[in-house]
Amino acid sequence: MTEHWENLNALTAPLLTWYDLNGRTLPWRSVVTPYRTWVSEIMLQQTRVSAVIPYFERFMAELPDAAALATVPEERLLKLWEGLGYYSRARNLQKAAKVIVSDFGGELPRKCAALKTLPGIGDYTAAAIASINFGEPVAAVDGNLLRVAARVSGCADDIMDARVRKQFTAHLNDAIDLARPGAYNKAMMDLGATVCLPNGAPKCEICPARMMCEAYKNGLTEVLPVRAKKKARKIEERTVLLLFQNGKAALRKRADTGLLASLWEFPSVLGNLDEAGVSLALAQMGLSAKSIEPAGSAKHIFTHIEWDMKGYFADVTGENDDLFWADAAAFDAAAIPTAFKKFAALVRARLQ
């Protein structure tokens, strides 16, 4: 199928007309600053808009600028981020904030190239900040824009291929409205998020690109965009130990690197253990169980791995230097990953 890149240029004017009437009302758009755009875009990576809104508002209330973000204790930062997942995003935000304060006078740099020198800011985020806040005509190319562009142009190449993404970026940069680059990027984001939907369910009847869209004209909306299949996730069985001693619950700090780095978790062991296995695992930790009872099961899906978890409550005696015994206040202050959300609620209900 022949690509029709000129369709992207033809889309620009009707797209902006559509956006002026249908653009989403979002908290980071009601009050627009480079800092707010930056934080919102980082939060929106891998996370739905509806889920981000309350986190964004809470974050802004406590950390309204780069100076506040640069100096907040990491434990508090991770607690504010709790539930959003991908905690390296929060750590990179703080690393970048420290550079912004030390090297840029507390204000984000105005150019895309300079923004990309900051930790955690890649091509897409830099383009979003630079276009929305400073009027730089650069396309913020993410999955939404690639999907729209692939369908409108009829490009059947793999959008996950770096060379193909570079080609799309060049054509989108050519199509961007020079007078309203920020509005163009937001319009494409909104079109992809609300109309040109993934998984074969686009709302073509209300799409401003309908008359120039190759996928619509050729019945290919369920085929485009083309993307290589992801590798199957590894499934890992884990037994989660919800331990209590003297009215406190056991937490353990994860390693400083890797998955869920530096966050608090419940002790766990690989495998699907029964009560006898739990008793043995506790003995290997230097603990003895006075009682053991099932605490249900939970599942959590990461990008490349899936945890199938079974939990047990246990009242224990003994000591283990890797464990921190948290009362209710300390438990509430700890940053515990969403992976353990179900178990955290069960533990919290038992703490006085």
Task: Enumerate the language-model features and the residues they cover.
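Catalytic cores of DNA base-excision repair glycosylases
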Residues: E3-N9, A13-E205, A209-E222, L287-S288
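Intrinsically disordered, low-complexity, charged terminal extensions of DNA damage-control enzymes
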Residues: M1-T25, S30, A193-Q352
